[in-house]
């Protein structure tokens, strides 16, 4: 049985009006679909509009043309139905792990006992039990990002939007976080749209990958990822993984080469 269509981007265009009346087209007629409980990745050359796209989906920016639909309803502003995790940890430095995770729940008016219980569930989900009373300055980068993920998931968004959330982490911590997120996706069924410049990350985590062209950004190709077994660092050496990785690398190399030659 086909899964329900959760998120849809239709003919989305973004034009920035520059000085001297010169327009810059950042996105050009982008079309994208994410089904319920699906893990979808977006990759593309630097400057192709990936972050602009996810900001429009999140309601942080507006499109010049086109539309974003969540459960068939037009998205025009930020909302609790979309949770966002960025490369920066965006934690409140004066709040403990527990209080950071509880913050959104408190803003919703959820009673103290209930929000403490729910926050604890998500702290355990990301493996930070025992650090409830720690401040962000006492945590490593990977631990801070775990808190950010727990805080976002605690608000139970319908879609989790992630913009290079592991980009600032060292290679070893990044792999640990990738495996953690893959496990969370399996256990919770959260719908995830994830931007990355890391092709390994895209193939490891994604069920489908949207490959964007250079600016003006549009969707060049959609790739289904079929890896056997559960996703882990062991998946990185599978023939299916390497074949998909090469296909994407060849596309991005072609984009870079054409840009360098001014085509």
Residue spans for each PLM region:
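Conserved ABC transporter NBD signature motif
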Residues: 66-78
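The feature captures the beta-strand-to-loop junction immediately N-terminal to the Walker
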Residues: 43-45
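Short coil-to-helix segment of the ABC ATPase nucleotide-binding domain corresponding to the Q-loop/switch region
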Residues: 95-103
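Conserved ABC ATPase "signature" region
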Residues: 102, 106, 113-130, 183
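Helix-to-loop junction immediately C-terminal to a conserved catalytic motif
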Residues: 58
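Conserved signature/switch motifs of ABC ATPase nucleotide-binding domains
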Residues: 134-137, 155
